Amino acid sequence: MLVSLNVLAAQEPPLPDTFAEHKIVMQISDPNPFKQTLVLNVAGNLVKYYGSTNMDLEIVAFGPGVRLMLEGNVNTPRIKALMATGVRFSACENTLTNFAKILGKKPKLIEGIDIVPAGAARIIQLNEAGYKTLKP
């Protein structure tokens, strides 16, 4: 029975094998649309400043911040544009499970967003791999 439960759990994406000079993880855990927009603004500014080849950036959402990554979000075009530059987005499976309890079904994410078992743990893993955390 444990084996089948593990198969259903979100698989942790592997840590990026990157030679980027700047490794950054950004946290979004706030439901405030202003803060969510700020995270996207900062990400866009970092891409412009460092260039996508000199920087590896992952935006990790957990708690109410996951709303930023839900399908149909007003920021979907901006998220897709950042993805096109190589920015990665990860959403917390724990949060999605809690949303499902409230909504009666799991919400859909914007296509291309990874699901990680625990958003906070993902940030810790990336920190341990040399990433610096930004929380605008």
Label for each model-derived stretch:
Residues 4-5:
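N-terminal signal peptide c-region/cleavage motif recognized by signal peptidases
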